[in-house]
Structure formats: C-alpha cells, structure tokens
Curated annotation (Swiss-Prot):
Name of encoding gene: cle7
Keyword annotations: Lyase, Membrane, Transmembrane, Transmembrane helix
The protein's name: Terpene cyclase cle7
First-listed, main subcellular location of the protein, grouped into a coarse class: membrane
Pfam families on file: Pyr4-TMTC
Subcellular location: Membrane
GO molecular function terms listed in the Swiss-Prot or TrEMBL record: lyase activity
Species of the source: Aspergillus versicolor
Membrane topology classification: Multi-pass membrane protein
Family: Belongs to the paxB family.
Length: 242
C-alpha cells in the first residue's frame, strides 16, 4: 500500500481526526454524486446542457485513472470513485445528446457532425495527461494534483458558460450547491491530512495547492452570485410578459 493511504501507520494525532477525515471524504463523494445526478435531471428538464464537455471529459479521464488504473486501497474511496465513474458516463452522454441539438452546435458544423469524436479524443487526451502525472509524481500525489485541477476547470468553465449564455437553462442552484459542497469538503480533507500528518502529506501544503483551492472558491462563489443575478433578470422578464 502506498504511503499515505495506510492509515494504520499514521501518527496518533492523525488517528484522532481520522473519523472526521473519512466523513469529509464521504460528504465530498456524496456531493459530487448528487451533482452528477442533478446535472442529468436538469439537462432533460430544460433540454439544454449546463456544463462543459471539456470539463466532463477531464473529470471522466481522472476517474478512469484513479478508479480503475490506480484505485485507492481505502474501500470508501474506491466505492466513491467508481460510483462517480459510472454516473459520469451518463452525464457525458446526456450533455453530448443535448449539445448536438443545441443552436451552438448547429452553428458549428464540424462540432455538430463529429461531436462523438471530440468527446472520445478529449477523454483519451486527458487520460494520458492524468496517467503521465501519476507516473511522474506517484499515484497518490497525482490523485490530488489532478483532482484540484479538475475542480478549477469545472468551476471556471461553468462560470464561463453562464456568463456567455446569459440564461440559466440547463443549470440550477442544486447543481451549483452540490458541486461547491463536494469540492470544499475534498479540499478540507486534503489540508487536514497535511496538518495532522505532515511527514507524509506535507507536500500538499504549498502555494500552488492553496492557489487551486482559492481559485475554486472564488470561481464557484462568483458563479453563485452570477446565477442569482441572472435568475432575477429572467424573473423580471417573465413578470413583464405576464
């Protein structure tokens, strides 16, 4: 077992917070699972995708590497990752389905015709990157470095889509809140490790990892504000029509 996953060898101070750590990890897993399910439901409700295929293919590639190729030995982590992978396949299918029929895809003939190839090569490309990082750094370090990058990409692209479209179809407060909760607990669990087991996890407490965490919080915070504002504008427009 790779050092860092073997909690039996951890110092007494870490063992004291181990139940909290597993709780945070479980809450993060549940939050993202709810996000994926809510994303599917919202896309079918509005007949419009609300997330970026770039971010989704990146997430799926990460899940393939760390749920199948380098699965963590912790049973709870293994179950969570494979649950994400299973549901994320349907998220990508649903998103691609409605992206193909959207006006954006219709105005881009190449994307409209070869969307399935863009998705496939996107997954393969990101998979190779996550795998390469796991070889370079070690699976456990790549798990978190790549994971933090995935959080920032997902939050940044979600904000970009919302601002670019100027409407909230395909999106919901539930998608945003579950994404934020899932991500914030994942970040908290990482820094909890570095605080109480610095001999093994000290590498994760550095300026770049803090930047990733800060970027995610800022981007998702801005998303919440922009979503609230856009919803208000939409409600005013409906009131005028009525």
């Amino acid at each position: 077992m790779e050092e860092g996953w073997d909690f039996d060898s951890s110092p007494p101070s870490f063992k004291q917070v181990q139940p909290l750590l597993l709780t945070l990890f479980s809450l993060s897993g549940t939050g993202w699972l709810i996000n994926y399910i809510t994303t599917i439901r919202t896309a079918y409700r509005d007949r419009t995708p609300g997330v970026s295929l770039v971010a989704l293919t990146n997430n799926l590639a990460w899940e393939l590497v760390f749920a199948i190729l380098h699965p963590p030995p912790l049973p709870v982590a293994k179950v969570i990752l494979r649950s994400w992978l299973f549901v994320d396949i349907f998220v990508i299918y649903t998103t691609a389905k409605f992206a193909r029929s959207s006006s954006i895809s219709s105005n881009a003939p190449l994307l409209h015709r070869y969307l399935h190839l863009f998705v496939l090569f996107g997954i393969l490309g990101f998979f190779s990157g996550h795998w390469a990082l796991s070889v370079l750094l070690s699976p456990i370090k790549a798990f978190y470095w790549s994971g933090m990058m995935c959080l920032v990409v997902m939050s940044g692209t979600a904000l970009g889509i919302l601002v670019q479209r100027g409407h909230t179809r395909g999106m919901s407060y539930g998608m945003w809140f579950s994404r934020f909760v899932g991500s914030i607990f994942a970040v908290a669990s990482l820094f909890l490790r570095s605080t109480y087991w610095p001999q093994v996890w000290g590498w994760s407490d550095n300026i770049l990892m803090r930047w990733f965490a800060g970027a995610f919080v800022v981007l998702d915070g801005l998303y919440g504000v922009c979503f609230w504002y856009t919803r208000r504008v939409e409600q005013r427009q409906r009131d005028k029509v009525a």
